[in-house]
Amino acid sequence: MNNIKKINLYLPIEGKAREFAPKVFLAITAAKKNIRVFIGSQASINRMIYNKKSSGGVYFFKGGLGINEVKKIKKKCSNFVILDEEVGPGDENPQFTMRYRIEKNIENEIDSYYVLGKETFEIAKKIFNKIKSRIILSGWPRIDYFLASAKLDKDSKLKKNIKKKYGNFILFISDYGQTSMRMVKLTHLQYSQKLDLSKRYNKKKLYEIDSSNKRALKEFKKFILILKNLDKENSIPTIIVRPHPLEDHEPWEKLKKSFSNIKIIFDGELEPWLYASRGVIHKGCSSAVQAYYANKPQAYLSLDKKNIRNALPYKISRHISSIKEIKKFSLDCLNNKNEFKKNNFSKEFNKVIHLSSKSASEIIVNDIKKLKPIKEFNFKPTFNIILKSWANNLIHNYNVYKFYIIRCILQFLGKHYVSSDIRLVSQHQKIPFGIFKSDVLRVLDTLGFAKNDIIVKSVLNDLISIEKK
């Protein structure tokens, strides 16, 4: 069956920690509809696409590409579709995010643009007026994954192991974005290169972004002072901090050694930590929605009112802004007090997140089939492609291992690692050590999917194929 022509769906992953498992859910949904799926790092997916002999299939991305990259992809793929995960439930300004991440000269290249809910659907139709017939109210595969994993979290071995090791704890999910001045400078550089600064509106927007990022850094520093005080408290459960994958982790690394009760943990997926916790404190990221589906008590921490994101995560959470309120929330979690239980906000949810009898993944897969992309045979890499992939992987892993070895040695000596290039650190954090067949199988186990009907194969380094037998 895997040697016949099928629709090929290409799913590039930018960040493994929060993108990978939901994309596997989408991949399995597609495979069940007889679509062959390739999931991997963006570099590996693109290497395959640019080297395949045929032209066909669907490239599924999250936005942010330039016109030259998109045209290059469309020469080798029948369709280019977008579900921009940056326009998530925690985004209080989806208008700006949509316009910033999709340049006007790219609009006509988009065959389908999938959106999270009714609010973003109406906004997208106004912003992308030329292609409004191609805008699909789909929902989000990440929500599909939240729902499925929340139902099965009681059986998770990882969750049980975490609870056994750490007991009762409160999980803080960091989403400051700006945890160092060099991160603020890098963000400024990225926006200044993307925005047309000859326009007054964009100059004003860049100033607003810079001001917001500096406030975020200031708030992060305030939070660190609070953590240092909370670390001395014995009356509350342990607080475990999970830094965001795209934050600068080096300030967190520096702090890690100075705490005794508070833990800063980078390893593994977020889900088992969330499900093992007694409650969640967050900064407005979409993980708040996952906590909501898991019926976990949650609180939105704000130490600067100007930095509050008045989006869905804020509306479904208790609002806290001091050590006293953090302590009270933590103790309430131990007593199972949760004023924001699931289904209390169904109307608010339905505005932001589209839920129907069909999952978001089903809606997207059905739309992909309607596009009628050219079917292709399975990809067979040549020796040269395998060699190039192996060499690139060797260089990447060498840099990753070097990074971690130096960091571990310095940690042992009571010091912390300072990188000369924050973008290099970011690469290690996004997809550390790569994407493997075992990663896919682990997600299938987590979700309780039967593996008997699915073929999972490693194609190249950081590139896996998934299809129906």
What are these regions (language model features)?
Residues F38, F60, V81, S112-Y114, ...:
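Hydrophobic/aromatic beta-strand patches that form the interior of the parallel beta-sheet core
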Residues K151-K254:
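Conserved catalytic-core segment of nucleotide-activated headgroup transferases in glycan assembly
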